[in-house]
Design a protein with these regions (language model features):
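Bacterial N-terminal signal peptides
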Residues: 10-21
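Formylglycine-dependent sulfatase
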Residues: 2, 7, 21-325
Length: 325
């Protein structure tokens, strides 16, 4: 992979780093690009393409076809807080989602502008598969909804790709589809649907370096976590195959991101690197693959920079008063 260095703030990120020029790179420049936004849960950049000793061939291939971001961070290592930041472009203290929706925390108002409202106003059909985990839910008027539960038991995982196929087939206009997977949230489950085919044990791995110590229990937790990452990679592969089979892949920007770090020592719920550093890969049609980006932060996180950039590129109104805008 080649390395692109930039002095831009930390997330020249999410959706369309290339600006309006992206439109000329899809197969039909008169069409707005579709957006497939993939979110996995409770995982940092412990993925093969980031150098972790775990087999994630589908995400590795996506990175080889697009851009891998080395310094992507969220403003808070909690599910609801980071997801609200992704969709509003605001810090938790600015949008009000300072705690988990499970505990009845929510945004200050359902009127806060967000990605879903912005893209709907720009003529996009919007859909979500998997949990939203932000309050109030009414603030996000998705046209299509499926599997609204957290699904930590990992039941009927094939339904994620099946519902995606249904949504994409029904979308004659440009679409925004957000797919939220339950892995790698606890409880760590060794295998689901016989995935991974060859699960790891604590004897196969070392503890993740940011833990600071290597203990048999931490090595086992690391193995359990890696098994979740191998499994979610397989499900993401199924999802990308659905997109390819639809014939719309060449007109679709694909974004993959984790919501925050792993639920491990010095990870989730903390402000350590293991809690707030996330993986982020963007693949968009017609651009050179195999790129890596190391953004130098001058304030703001990946989550903040997301919304101002994508709404501008897609022809929707550009949000004002957002961090990094």
């Amino acid at each position: 992979m080649s390395l692109v260095k930039t002095a831009s703030p930390v997330a020249m990120l999410l959706f369309f780093v290339m600006g309006i020029s992206l439109w000329g790179q899809v197969s039909d420049p008169e069409k707005k690009p579709n957006i497939l936004f993939i979110v996995s849960e409770d995982n940092g950049p412990e993925i093969g393409c980031y150098g972790a000793p775990v087999k994630t061939p589908h995400l590795d291939e996506m990175a080889s076809q697009g851009t891998l971001f080395r310094n992507a961070y969220v403003p808070q290592a909690g599910c609801s807080q980071s997801r609200a930041a992704f969709l509003t472009g605001l810090y938790p203290h600015q949008n009000g989602q300072i705690g988990l929706a499970t505990w009845n925390y929510g945004m200050y108002s359902g009127e806060i502008k967000n990605v879903v409202k912005t893209l709907s106003g720009a003529g996009y059909r919007t859909g979500i598969i998997g949990k939203l985990h932000i309050n109030p839910k009414s603030a996000f008027p998705f046209d299509f909804k499926a599997i609204p539960s957290a699904n930590f038991s990992r039941k009927d995982m094939a339904a994620y790709a099946e519902n995606a196929a249904k949504f994409i087939k029904q979308s004659d206009e440009a679409f925004y589809l957000q797919v939220n997977y339950p892995d790698a949230h606890r409880p760590f489950i060794k295998t689901v649907d016989k995935l991974p085919a060859k699960p790891l044990t604590g004897k196969d791995v070392d503890a993740i370096p940011y833990m600071g110590i290597s203990h048999p229990e931490l090595r086992q937790q690391t193995a359990d976590y890696y098994n979740c990452m191998m499994r979610v990679d397989s499900y993401i592969g199924d999802l990308l195959q659905v997109l390819e089979a639809s014939g719309k892949s060449k007109d679709t920007v694909v974004v993959y991101i984790g919501d925050h770090g792993a639920d491990l020592l010095r990870g989730k719920r903390t402000s350590y690197e293991g809690g707030v550093k996330i993986p982020m890969i963007i693949r968009w049609p017609g651009t050179k693959g195999g790129q890596q980006m190391r953004c130098q932060s001058r304030g703001g996180s990946a989550a903040h920079r997301e919304h101002p950039s994508d709404s501008h590129v897609l022809g929707a109104f550009r949000l004002r008063k957002c961090p990094g805008s």
